[in-house]
Amino acid sequence: MTALAELVKRPPPDADPAQTLRIRNVGIAVGLAGVALVAAALVANVFVASDEAGVDNLFWTFGVSITGFATIKLGIAIVLTGIIVRLWMRVDAVKAALPRLRAHAAPEGSVQYGNIETPFGPATLTEKAPGLLPPQAMARIMWKPMILMGPMLVLVGLVLSLFTTGADDPETSQALWAWTQGTQFLGEAMLLAGISFLLGTILAGLREGGGEVQESLGLAVKSLRMPTSAKFFLVLMFGGLMLGIAQFVLYGIAAYVDDPATWFAWLGPLRELSLGILLSGIVLALFTIGTVLGFQHWRIRQIIETGR
């Protein structure tokens, strides 16, 4: 329960940054469990390949392997929640140390608030810390349902794969196999969307924490405007998620058509495309986090050297 509390609670300002976060260990254990599931599916497939009569077992081994990949993604998501906790520890540490490091500066005259340019792109200068950008506020809300629903759908798909293995009627087997694939890959898409929202939550914490530190020093607050990489990240994330939902609907249609093989031939690449788009968005989110960290390093150095 203590580990779960770390997911949603900002640590107190006097929290020891050297402490080991339980949630990180949980994330690593979950990730290793996912690797074990994928390895088990691989071994099972090797045995199935040598037994033509057992080809129907490929249905459940598929379900197990996809469940393994989803479990690895869940482990990544859990570790990211620990990073959010570390981020707030960093904010509190900087708030405590920066006043002692800050150069003495004469009081500023009138300050021209508004848009400014920085080495890391356009920014704004405000008297108070700005609020979160709408996508960041949404990310803080949406990562939890996505991380919850994604594994649930993957497990539903795993159960369907077991029923597919035992189905005697070809039409029933076809329908179950289609729903297995569509359901599991919708769960995979939701998990990647949840990871994307967690990265958005990290960006939200960087924006909020950076403004909080500057405001606590009585300084004008410099905040990056949304970088271009963040805008493309949003496009890719929502595009990939919508495509993941679309493949689920299309697999539902394919479950009852006369020629499912034709549908399966292009639905397979389509579902992989949805995950690829989501992963590309995650790459841009990580790039954006690097940009924001660089900006904050530049701002901290500016405060230390100039006092402003």
Regions found by a protein language model. Name each.
Residues 26, 33, 37, 52, ...:
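Extended, solvent-exposed polar beta/coil surface segments
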Residues 26, 42, 62, 141, ...:
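Charge-rich, solvent-exposed alpha-helical interaction surfaces
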Residues 12-36, 130-152, 221-241:
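Juxtamembrane interface helix immediately N-terminal to a transmembrane segment
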Residues 4, 97-137, 211-226:
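Charge-rich cytosolic interhelical loops and cytosolic tails of multi-pass membrane proteins
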Residues 1-17:
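Short, Lys/Arg-rich, polar N-terminal cytosolic tail immediately upstream
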Residues 56-105, 172-234, 259-308:
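Extended alpha-helical segments
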Residues 39-54, 156-172, 245-259:
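Membrane-helix interface motif
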Residues 34-42, 82, 154-157, 191, ...:
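Helical transmembrane-bundle signal
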